[in-house]
Amino acid sequence: MDAGLDNPFWSALQTIHRDLAETRGPVARYPAEYAPFAGVASPDGDCGDALEALTGEGEAVYLLGIAPRAVPAGWQLQAFRPLAQMVCDAPLVVTEGPEIIPLTETHRRDVLALTAKVYPHYFRTRTMSLGRYFGIYQDGQLAAMIGERLGTDASREMSAICTHPDYNGRGCARRLTAWLT
């Protein structure tokens, strides 16, 4: 398994997204218009000053995997939750269904509307620039989408797997997930 998955935000910002990384000492983050994610190199580092320098007043950032052992002065831990991280070892069987198309800059308005409705806060105005995104249109509307956002040199995250509520239960998300594996 890819060791970078133990500290995915930090790993992505040191590998495939190194050109985007805003880094200060032991902390790196995505620019806010891309994602609200930051990573720390080690749980033992003193990262309070670096976090403060890299974030705006009142801005929430999310860490995944490795986090500071102690909450830096001036910061508030609002939630600490477990997260299931799954690795697909073999491609899934793709079911028949509607056409899957690459989502490009011309689809940005539709993508932002769908993610605002069903996947708010984590998908930002420039998130699509982080990787490849694909979708299914039905009745002239973006019915479902999937993308690859984070990653390392060896792995990619499937992200923004979402379906418009009017199209739930039709297998669109499953089709997209299988197709992308």
Give the residues covered by each predicted segment.
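Short amphipathic alpha-helix that is part of the acyltransferase structural core
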Residues: 1-5, 89-121
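Acyl-donor-binding surface of acyltransferase catalytic domains
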Residues: 2-96
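A short, internal acetyl-CoA/4′-phosphopantetheine-binding micro-motif in the GNAT/acyltransferase core
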Residues: 36-41, 161-169
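Conserved acetyl-CoA-binding loop-helix of GNAT-fold acetyltransferases
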Residues: 46-51, 163, 169-181
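A generic "binding-loop/recognition-motif" signal
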Residues: 67, 107, 154
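Generic beta-strand structural signal
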Residues: 82-84, 98-99, 132, 144
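A conserved beta-strand-loop-helix scaffold within acyl/acetyltransferase catalytic domains
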Residues: 122-165
